[in-house]
Amino acid sequence: MGNITESPVWEDNVLQIEVGDSVGGGPLAVANLQAQDLANRTQYLKAKADTADKNIDDLFNDMNRIYNGQDLTTKFADEIATYSDDPWAWIKARITAVDYGGLNIGDYIPFSMGGNAIKAQIAGIDTYYRANDVETGHHIDFISKDCYPTPVPWNTTNINNGNATNAAPWMVCNLKNVINTTWYNSLPAPLKAQIIEKRAYIETRYTSGSTLTDSTGAAWNDIGKLWVPSEGEVYGTVHWGTKGYSSMQNAEYPIFAASWRNRIKGIGDGGARCRWWLLSVYGGNSTYVCSVSHGGLADYYDASFATVYAPVCFRIG
């Protein structure tokens, strides 16, 4: 007697031994095939049940806001291997196929940028699907768990207005320029190959010959291949921005909803808590820009303040 080797395969049919069949012996003998079919089914159902248990645990962790996320390059290593071990080509293919099975808010893809470890977390899945003046397709927006370890002033001069080139403050600020040149150029080539521009309806604040203290309108803009979220995308409401114009289109990213867990970010991967910039500018003032404090509060700092950080944020779709 020996043991049957089980495989997690669903057998559509279970062999029926007929009168006159030669029974024989060994793993491929007729006498053993029926048991083999049933054993395979049992192993298949066990694998499915184990996966369901794990998914339920993850769901409850998410409901309790204690889900830390999983490394997708480990969780889906076998799938990624079929894309020449390129996780970015793999996630792009998943998005194109609208196959989000096993992908959860907070899960991440790790990579190196300028010699620094970055964990790009899933912040939202199809958060802006079909929105905007130009219809947005299927996408995933990623926001790094912690900030890039080099601080960047939001502006080189202490002003939060747009200018004659573009009335939207974000579009002409120093932070947008730095992250879309220096930072972007430090990204791995396979990641750059998959990033697309994020388009958004963002506030405008500019009048020739004047310095404005409130935003007076909004306009559609391609806000960059790298960007930072708005106040509304982090907090789900306006705290310091101009009422109306600063958050007309924003949806709160699920990763920030109902918890401060992911609003609080460190200086580099796992580093000390830090303050970090948002896209929105302050209402009622010509120098402040909205931010997140190192304790997670909705905050603001002078646009030229030099020791505020930013996460690495991008869209694949």
PLM feature segments, named:
Residues 52-55, 203:
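Compositionally biased non-globular segments, especially hydrophobic aliphatic-rich helices
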Residues 23-24, 53-54, 84:
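Short, Lys/Arg-enriched charge-dense amphipathic segments
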